[in-house]
From Swiss-Prot:
One term of GO molecular function: zinc ion binding
GO biological process, one term: response to antibiotic
A Pfam family hit: TcaA_5th
UniProt-annotated location(s): Cell membrane
Bilayer topology: Single-pass membrane protein
The keyword GTP-binding belongs to this UniProt entry's keyword annotation: no
Topology feature Extracellular, residues: 71-460
GO CC terms, sorted: plasma membrane
Keywords recorded for this protein, A-Z: Antibiotic resistance, Cell membrane, Membrane, Metal-binding, Transmembrane, Transmembrane helix, Zinc, Zinc-finger
Name listed for the protein in its UniProt record: Membrane-associated protein TcaA
UniProt-listed InterPro entries: Mem_prot_TcaA (IPR023599), TcaA_2nd (IPR054529), TcaA_4th (IPR054530)
Topological domains annotated Cytoplasmic: 1-49
Length: 460
């Protein structure tokens, strides 16, 4: 279609004269327009053929760009560079993220210790070189899947392993720090509270029992902590150093504000050793000159006293108070008994015991003769006056006499004797009918006119 230049009437391309106004169309102009339309149509066909190739080319360019982008962030070398940069820049949060596993969460403070440990025990330059060489060898190897970076002393500090692939093309490298268990062994039941893996943690350790407090990556640690025992609460640190261990555990050194008490007793020579006690803050314990008591918090006063027995009587020292300002890690204190008071009492009791022993010697000499006469004559009356009527021992001896099973005794010796009111306990060594020496414990009752009678007996 074409338009009349004079009136604007539409006409077919092959029409020579306008039907509206009679204008004669130029035939050369129509021919030119036809040629131009054919060229445009030809060019359009060529363009349509080129579009798919252009799209393919564009996609290839995008794929190449994407590949290089992925390689920059996901190749083994790129993964290595991320870890190296984090360590070089002391990026503890990034290192914590890279080293954390499902089973062991690493927090930023632990990562900070780890970074310092690498720089001290390997050296940053050497670590980077070892890491790059290890990754390169693993990446090229078809058999090896893991290797370790070590400190100058030969301890493993980082495990590098192949763990599948990333985006099909790249080996996925895993960086894992080996762990050890720090262990405590307190003298008494202790509760420890500290932060680990980004969370508050509580560990309860029984007395004299090895107890792990968790899993930690290599480093030299000084962890703020609180501990609680029967003696009080303590603020301080749990310290441990991987350099000091060649096993799967590392010993913890406790650094708390605590005082340990060494006690010396004076004036106690007459006291029974097994009866000596020390009371610290109302808690009574057996005394030993070689024992250290504690620990106790250094921020609280301590009260302390001692006690012991002599001849059945308990003697005590004065209670002393150790001010918090005077407490040290090792604190010594001396407690004094009234030695004159103890010696006077012991002397008095020994006189009484000697008098009592003499009575008992006389009593058991007669009792042994009466016992043997009752056995020989099968007559309980010989021995009945020595035993309290109505007691179980009275009935037992009477029955033995009637059955002829009473044991003969001789040579009684008084080993020990104590009197409590009208009751007397005596340890007597004698010879039985088989000629064997035996120790027997007797209980006697002292009646009117100091008359002694047996109540019961037992083998020592």
């Amino acid at each position: 279609m074409k338009s009349c230049p004079k009136c604007g009437q539409q006409a077919q391309d092959d029409v020579q004269i306008c039907t509206q106004c009679g204008h004669k169309f130029d035939s050369r102009q129509a021919l030119y327009r036809k040629s131009t339309d054919e060229d445009i149509q030809t060019n359009n066909i060529k363009m349509r053929k080129m579009v798919p190739w252009a799209i393919v080319f564009f996609i290839l360019i995008l794929i190449i760009i994407l590949f290089f982008l992925l390689r920059n962030f996901n190749s083994p070398e790129a993964q290595t560079k991320i870890l190296v940069n984090a360590i070089e820049n002391n990026d503890k949060q990034k290192v914590a993220t890279l080293l954390s596993t499902k089973d062991n969460k690493v927090d930023s403070e632990e990562a900070k210790v780890y970074i310092n440990y690498i720089k001290d025990e390997v050296g940053l330059k050497q670590f980077v070189s070892d890491l790059k060489n290890t990754v390169h060898k693993l990446n090229k190897s078809k058999t090896s899947v893991a290797s370790y970076i070590q400190t100058r002393s030969g301890q493993n500090i980082l495990r590098v392993s192949k763990n599948g692939t990333r985006y099909i093309f790249f080996d996925n490298m895993s960086f894992t720090a080996p762990t050890k268990q720090p262990i405590v062994k307190p003298k008494e039941k202790t509760k420890y509270e500290f932060k680990s893996g980004g969370k508050k943690k509580m560990v309860i350790a029984e007395a004299n029992k090895v107890t792990p407090i968790g899993n930690f990556i290599p480093g030299t640690y000084r962890i703020p902590a609180m501990k609680s025992t029967e003696n009080g609460d303590f603020a301080g640190y749990l310290k441990f150093d991987f350099r000091q261990s060649n096993s799967e555990t590392v010993d913890v050194t406790e650094d708390f504000e605590e005082a340990n008490i060494t006690v010396t007793l004076k004036g106690d020579t007459k006291l029974n050793d097994s009866s000596k006690k020390v009371t610290i803050n109302d808690r009574e314990m057996a005394f030993s000159s070689s024992k250290t008591y504690g620990p106790y918090p250094q921020n609280k006063d301590i009260t302390i006293s001692a006690s012991g027995k002599a001849k059945g009587k308990t003697f005590t020292t004065q209670t002393k108070t150790i001010k918090a300002s005077d407490l040290k890690y090792n604190t010594e204190i001396t407690l004094n008994f009234d030695s004159e008071d103890i010696e006077d009492y012991v002397e008095k009791k020994e006189k009484e015991e000697n008098s009592l022993k003499n009575k008992l010697i006389e009593f058991f000499a007669g009792y042994s003769l009466a016992n043997n006469a009752a056995f020989n004559q099968s007559d309980f009356d010989f021995v009945s006056s020595y035993i309290k009527k109505g007691s179980s021992f009275y009935d037992d001896v009477k029955k033995r006499v009637s059955k002829g099973s009473l044991m003969m005794i001789s040579s009684p010796q008084i080993i020990d004797a104590e009197k409590h009111g009208d009751k007397i306990t005596a340890t007597v060594r004698l010879i039985n009918e088989n000629g064997k020496q035996v120790d027997k414990e007797y209980e006697l009752e002292q009646g009117s006119q100091d008359r002694l009678q047996l109540i019961k007996t037992s083998e020592k």
